[in-house]
Amino acid sequence: MASPALISETEAWKDLKAHLEGIKTTHLRELMGDTERCQSMMVEFDNIFLDYSRQQASPDTINKLYKLADAAHLKQKIDRMYNGDHINITENRSVLHVALRAPRNSAICSDGKNVVPDVWNVLDKIKDFSDRVRNGSWIGATGKELKDVIAVGIGGSFLGPLFVHTALQTDPEASKNARGRELRFLANVDPIDVARNISGLNPETTLVVVVSKTFTTAETMLNARTLREWISSALGPSAVAKHMVAVSTNLPLVEKFGIDPINTFAFWDWVGGRYSVCSAVGVLPLSLQYGFAVVEKFLQGAHSIDQHFSSAPFEKNIPVLLGLLSVWNVSFLGYPARAILPYSQALEKLAPHIQQVSMESNGKGVSIDGLPLPFESGEIDFGEPGTNGQHSFYQLIHQGRVIPCDFIGVVKSQQPVYLKGEVVNNHDELMSNFFAQPDALAYGKTPEQLKKENVSEHLIPHKTFTGNRPSLSILLPTLDAYRIGQLLAIYEHRVAVQGFVWGINSFDQWGVELGKSLATQVRKQLHASRVKGEPVEGFNFSTKTLLTRYLEATSDVPADPSTLLPNI
């Protein structure tokens, strides 16, 4: 008998639907009272501890989710990814970001070819180049050392490397290696982002890394041309070869731009942008800032989770458990969002990166076979470090909409602070909130409890917390390069699990194309109106009105302006 075309047509899905009502009427207060249940919902790997006992789920729920995973052929899909099969069928590509952090002696194939040697050729080239820049043997056009780096990219070429950079900045080993150096990321085509990036920097000591696979990405290439002008206007056109390098596959366009192809670092079609932080996209700028040895530890951490994900049984497999619970929360309990709440300021850019990884991967409305999905998939991801978020949006999480939460804590702070006479140290104060918030969400506070506390009758409705709000807790032992790599890979694979179970293609992103094509039409109109004075035509009334208003208000912009760079 053929497998159902949609996962929602399987008996496992229908069984979970039937199971749903019993769970909805069982409060987390009751579920948390079952010690045996709680113990069964705690998993540890390599000193990473996952506690998902505060999920709205019973052991029976979890077993039914395992059956759903089997019905979705989850294990086979994971194996196909690792085997280099073209699981991204709309672009006919392998999905092999795991190869980017594989040990040198590994064998991971795409189209019958082991890609690991190619990966390590690029890594070796990055190590050699970053070492030369850092030790001063590669210098700028005027003989000065290149201490400052601006990485130019957008989307996955920006958010992932920025997350890792921000997480490493306060790590003792990494911060020591980065002394006297500066790493910035230019992503937005907004000239304000250009101004902020070049502010305080000297072109003589600045190296620009342009990240674009095709070297045609509109925003990235406009920013790259802007920085090329910034360098050449200060140092002369010939300086570009010493002050700009590329991460790209399009060597002819790189050379035409003025960058020596020798100073180009490759990556491959089997690497999606949002999964590319472990390629030259992230490894090159991060190695320039922190040294290759630190970044290699990051890659090793990611690889450790790759191995865990591919080999651990589902009941002990952290990414699988997280992915299945997300499917349960989104498609069965009907919760459309997820809050990512790291209790570490070093992880302040985790949520924005995972927002892209998750929402670009799983924001799909059709199955991998092109069938409309009759259920909700994907979730809205957002977050902020604790305790900052507690003074921002936790009000809604506690007393408004139900939003499942990921609490991420770190046992040992990167930068401990102790003050004599304080009841607890700074990190203990932070972690007190990490441990308290999940219980507040799960248990809430009843009117009866408030009455016993002699709360005024008219305030009781306002101070009541319904509880029964699901969360999970991830406890990391430390936050060094290795652990940062592990955390990244956990979330990458979690997203893949969700997509595999929902039966969607998590590795394409056609949703970004329509807006880009319409922007091309607008761009042509702006040029025609500014240069030739042509009226706005070919748009709906709303867009025509807005465009006309914009053009009239910027009529002082010259049709053929001379170069003007930010002055800040």
Curated annotation (Swiss-Prot):
It catalyses: alpha-D-glucose 6-phosphate = beta-D-fructose 6-phosphate. GO terms for cellular component: cytosol. The active site is at 360 (proton donor), 391, 516. Its EC number is 5.3.1.9. It is found in: Cytoplasm. GO terms for molecular function: carbohydrate derivative binding; glucose-6-phosphate isomerase activity; monosaccharide binding. Signal peptide: none annotated. Pfam families: PGI. It comes from the Eukaryota. It is an enzyme of class 5 (isomerase). GO terms for biological process: gluconeogenesis; glucose 6-phosphate metabolic process; glycolytic process. SUPFAM superfamilies: SIS domain. The keyword Secreted does not apply. Keywords: Cytoplasm, Gluconeogenesis, Glycolysis, Isomerase. Homodimer. Belongs to the GPI family. HAMAP family: G6P_isomerase (MF_00473). This is Glucose-6-phosphate isomerase, cytosolic 1. It comes from Clarkia franciscana. The lineage of its organism: Eukaryota, Viridiplantae, Streptophyta, Embryophyta, Tracheophyta.
